[in-house]
Amino acid sequence: MELMRARAPAKINLTLRIEGRRADGFHDLASLVAFAGAGDLVFLHPDAPLALEVCGPTAAAAGPDDDNLVLRAARAFAERVPGARLGRFVLEKRLPVAAGLGGGSSDAAAALRLLAGLNGLALDDPRLFAAARATGSDVPVCLDPRARLMRGVGDVLSAPLALPPLSAVLVNCRVAVPTAGVFRALGLAPGAALAGPEHPAGLPETTMGNAAAVCAFLSGLPNDLEPPALALAPEIGRAMALLSEAPEARLVRMSGSGATVFALTDSCRTAASLARRLLAQQPGWWVKPTLLR
């Protein structure tokens, strides 16, 4: 069988409300997520012994191959699908690591989609979702990468949302920010709630096909992990300040637990212009104009 290929798009948290910490230590959240054109690539050589090779511009930061979520996802799949055909994966790593982009989770979800195709499973097969959930909290939402509201620990998903395409610039200052450290810095004790407004249940009808209305809606919905992430990595604040000063930026936020931040713009042209200017100012940063869907 021929080499199989799947995209693993970056997951962008347009909003992130931390509702509280459970007794088991996990955090309940509500987040409106979208997916970018930028991402990693996952390849599968069918029916070879299960293995993983990582290559690409950010491969060196991805950690040991044996710890990669791609292999964890494949093993979770095999546990739930007796006699499953597997293979050798090649992960072309393009996204920054520990960046708040859900890169590892999206890679794992792409691997599960490839294995589903190889074994004749539909994407809505409950075994696929179970394998995703066993692999990591952000993997289920990445299985079908379309804009959604995610709740719980990431395992309660809405139907796909009618989000208009949003022009954006993604910026990472090359500082890795481990998710666990940011949640620790948030400082919630088990069983405690985080004060704040309730997250909306979806997008208002006024945002249908209207990117400007989406920006206005998002402006009142912050990312609750920004303060602890900024305390751990002040460079994030510098990136946000540069974006906020740009006339093209309509909304500036941090994605996930950082350190990637994004600016929404009016068009792909203004996003590309802003990205070029930022790269000229900060040639060492990772900067990508993209579309969020």
Curated annotation (Swiss-Prot):
The active site is at K11, D138. It comes from the Bacteria. Gene3D superfamilies: 3.30.230.10, GHMP kinase, C-terminal domain. GO terms for biological process: isopentenyl diphosphate biosynthetic process, methylerythritol 4-phosphate pathway; terpenoid biosynthetic process. This is 4-diphosphocytidyl-2-C-methyl-D-erythritol kinase. Catalyzes the phosphorylation of the position 2 hydroxy group of 4-diphosphocytidyl-2C-methyl-D-erythritol. It comes from Xanthobacter autotrophicus (strain ATCC BAA-1158 / Py2). Keywords: ATP-binding, Isoprene biosynthesis, Kinase, Nucleotide-binding, Transferase. Pathway: Isoprenoid biosynthesis; isopentenyl diphosphate biosynthesis via DXP pathway; isopentenyl diphosphate from 1-deoxy-D-xylulose 5-phosphate: step 3/6. It catalyses: 4-CDP-2-C-methyl-D-erythritol + ATP = 4-CDP-2-C-methyl-D-erythritol 2-phosphate + ADP + H(+). The gene is ispE. Pfam families: GHMP_kinases_C, GHMP_kinases_N.
